UniProtKB/Swiss-Prot annotation:
UniProt-annotated site: Transition state stabilizer, residues: N102
Functional description taken from the UniProt entry: Bifunctional enzyme that catalyzes the oxidative decarboxylation of UDP-glucuronic acid (UDP-GlcUA) to UDP-4-keto-arabinose (UDP-Ara4O) and the addition of a formyl group to UDP-4-amino-4-deoxy-L-arabinose (UDP-L-Ara4N) to form UDP-L-4-formamido-arabinose (UDP-L-Ara4FN). The modified arabinose is attached to lipid A and is required for resistance to polymyxin and cationic antimicrobial peptides.
Protein name listed in UniProt: Bifunctional polymyxin resistance protein ArnA
UniProt catalytic activity: UDP-alpha-D-glucuronate + NAD(+) = UDP-beta-L-threo-pentopyranos-4-ulose + CO2 + NADH; UDP-4-amino-4-deoxy-beta-L-arabinose + (6R)-10-formyltetrahydrofolate = UDP-4-deoxy-4-formamido-beta-L-arabinose + (6S)-5,6,7,8-tetrahydrofolate + H(+)
The enzyme's E.C. designation: 2.1.2.13, 1.1.1.305
Region of interest (Formyltransferase ArnAFT), ranges: 1-304
TM segment ranges: none
InterPro entries assigned: Arna-like_SDR_e, Bifun_polymyxin_resist_ArnA, Epimerase_deHydtase, Formyl_trans_C, Formyl_transf_N, Formyl_transf_N_sf, Formyl_transferase-like_C_sf, Lipid_A_modif_metabolic_enz
UniProt binding sites for UDP-alpha-D-glucuronate: 393, 398, 432-433, 460, 492, 526-535, 613
Length: 660
């Protein structure tokens, strides 16, 4: 059976040898070039492959069409992935008629993602293992073929556990590969309700939090000890690395981080304490704990913890243009709640942000982005993160005012992008699900889906192509001039303060606001083209949490990324949304204030939006990037969103009636 192997690390070497022993005909091996900044405690797949006489490649992007074609020419029966660090496209996976299999270092569905061995120790697990599973478009989510369990002892480090997992992998493959070769194997679907996902770890994750209990600190020490960068703390500005430690039961009533004794070196945790067995200063030798205390001048009752200067770190400054809009005002609320941000905002009105006026961390000016260019340039220079949320984003305006859409959505935003390049500022740009246009994929993928729009005489696409062109310009600035950016694509976000009923009265609003207006006024609900178009509705709170995590940008994982933010499980047609809204309306406590329901009315899109409109049948996001980069999943169902949105507008309408 002809096999192509994607492999790296010790597990990759174990996999290659197991395949050879099982009689697989390995056509080629794809691996990675070694990173000079990485501690290579593991064997080289390239070297082992060469010694086995195998053909080896290390492409930067194996999913490039040229590499896909080369793999197709090899005509593999089966594909194996052993600790290969890049996702393989569906096009590659579909080239193997007998299937594609991945070996993962955990007992799936637990610990999907990166560094599962380290994470298992950090979290204090007592058991892990290896899983061989079918590969799918979603990372580590395919049906399970086989698993081998591994016990984690209290004294195991990541290196010791890695050796155990390597032995388990060899045992699993020796037993399972012959069954795959014969086609005589069964699979078990993963239980998604039990799935957990963890991202990559970096050296900074080794910072010790002495407010944790002693067992938690000890778990961190053994998870990141050699060959990893180590767990660390600071004495003032000086770094102290702890390589080996043991938990102690009694902290003697000391505050977390307080040195209880120096011989042995014992440091208090919130519960219990840690005895430092070995460690070193940043530029010192590997020594015993008591010797480390002497070298660093550590004395009893001194406190260690975060770096002294880190404790006086200033808040990040975020500039939000269009701060009074739907996303802008909800994002402001989330940032202020966090407490680590100063928000500077501009908009032509303030109706949605009046609740923030007077907050010392919220700074607002009423203004127009096309006029107040000096203020904008100054604040881009002053702030750390820029979010230009100003845009015309209501479908009727695409055909009614196409030139204004282009001028604001493209030209004015291009100026802001160029200021960010000029002053080397990070921009988080709101792309749109509209850029996918009439894409025919079942799920719209940020990295692979085609962006398909209609002919020139269909002017509704001017919004889509304006946004798409800005996406491409921003990407080019990132590639050529080092612009730090993230593009996010909202999929039908809904919630309180989405547009307002006055904008709905002139047709310039999103679908749910227009539907609510029909109910409030007792006019027929208009279903454009029968309302059969399907969308995936996302609660504003889910969306804002994802956007907040993009702003946080832990480990800089969001730099240079495009991220769909939507809820693929909340798919419904506009007609179904209207029926759900009607049901909530009839059950609402304020129902008696409004006229009887006037029924549904089917209309053609041209009579509603005007000449030049064209609609899309479905728009479902792939959210694998959001899951991987943000550790985010939407949780709120459409009905809850509809109820909260309806309640907001009905209470506003009743208040308006009372003021007349």
């Amino acid at each position: 059976m002809k096999a192509i192997v994607f492999a790296y690390h010790d597990i990759g070497c174990v996999g290659l040898k197991a395949l050879e022993k099982a009689g697989f005909d390995i056509q080629a091996v794809f691996t990675h070039t070694d990173d000079p900044n990485e501690n290579h405690f593991f064997s080289s797949v390239a070297r082992v492959s060469a010694e086995m006489g195998l053909t080896v490649f290390a492409p930067e992007n194996v999913n490039h069409p040229l590499w896909i074609e080369r793999i197709r020419e090899m005509k593999p029966d089966v594909i194996f992935s052993f600790y290969y660090r890049h996702m393989l496209s569906d096009e590659i996976l579909n080239l193997a008629p007998k299937g594609a299999f991945n070996l993962h270092g955990s007992l799936l569905p637990k610990y999907r993602g990166r560094a599962p061995i380290n994470w298992a120790i950090v979290n204090g697990e007592t058991e892990t293992g290896v899983t061989l599973h079918k590969m799918t478009a979603k990372a580590d989510a395919g049906d399970i073929v086989a698993q081998e369990k591994v016990t984690i002892e209290d004294t195991d480090t990541s290196l010791i556990l890695h050796e155990k997992v390597r032995e388990a992998a060899a045992k699993l493959m020796a037993h399972t590969l012959p069954h795959i070769a014969s086609g005589n194997y069964s699979t078990t679907a993963q239980d998604e309700s039990q799935a957990t996902y963890y991202g990559r770890r970096c050296a900074d994750d080794g910072l010790i939090d002495w407010n944790a209990d002693a067992k938690t600190v000890h778990n961190l020490v053994r998870a990141v000890t050699e060959p990893y960068p180590g767990a660390f703390t600071f004495l003032g500005e000086r770094k102290m690395i702890i390589w080996r430690a043991r938990p102690v039961a009694d902290n003697q009533g000391k505050r977390p981080g307080t040195v209880i004794s120096t011989e042995p070196l014992v440091i208090a945790c919130a519960k219990g304490a840690i005895e430092v067995i070995t460690g070193q200063s940043e530029n010192g030798l590997y020594v015993q704990g008591s010797r480390l205390a002497t070298e660093m001048g550590i004395v009893t009752d001194v406190r260690v913890g975060p770096k002294a200067t880190a404790q006086v770190k200033r808040r990040q400054r975020v500039l939000i243009l269009g701060v009074n809009g739907f996303i802008g005002n909800h994002l402001t609320e989330r940032l202020l709640k966090d407490g680590n941000y100063d928000i500077y905002g501009m908009d032509i009105g303030s109706s949605a942000i009046e609740r923030f006026i007077g907050n010392p961390r919220f700074h607002f000016i009423e203004g127009d982005v096309s006029i107040h260019t000096e203020w904008i340039e100054y604040h881009i220079k002053k702030c750390d993160v820029i979010l230009p949320l100003v845009a015309i984003a209501t479908p009727i305006e695409y055909t009614r005012n196409p030139l204004r859409v282009f001028e604001l959505d493209f030209e004015e935003n291009l100026k802001i992008v160029r200021y960010c390049v000029k002053y080397n500022k990070r921009i988080i740009f709101p792309s749109t699900s509209e850029v996918y246009g009439m894409c025919d994929d079942k799920e719209f993928d940020e990295d692979n889906s085609r962006l398909i729009v209609g002919p020139i005489n269909k002017q509704r696409w001017i919004y889509s192509v304006s946004k798409q062109l800005l996406d491409r310009v921003i990407w080019a600035y990132g590639a050529k001039e080092g612009l730090k950016f993230t593009l996010f694509r909202p999929f039908n976000w809904m919630g309180p303060r989405l547009d307002n009923l006055n904008s709905a009265r002139i047709g310039s609003s999103r679908a749910i606001t227009q539907l609510i207006l029909n109910l409030v006024e007792g006019s027929p609900i208009k279903l454009v083209d029968g309302g059969e178009q399907k969308r995936c509705f996302t609660d504003i709170n889910d969306g804002i949490e994802a956007l907040f995590r993009i702003i946080e940008n832990r480990d800089n994982k969001c730099d240079g990324q495009i991220i769909n933010i939507g809820n693929p499980t909340n798919e419904a047609s506009i007609r179904e949304l209207a029926e759900m809204l009607l049901d909530c309306f009839e059950k609402h406590e304020l129902r008696g204030h409004f006229p009887p329901f006037a029924g549904f009315k089917k209309i053609e899109s041209s009579s509603y939006y005007g000449k030049g409109y064209q609609d899309v049948e479905h728009r479902k996001p792939s959210i694998k990037n959001a899951e991987r980069l943000l550790d985010w999943k939407p949780t709120i169902e459409t009905r809850q969103t509809v109820e909260e949105t309806l309640d907001f507008f009905l209470r506003g309408a009743v208040e308006e009636l009372g003021n007349k």
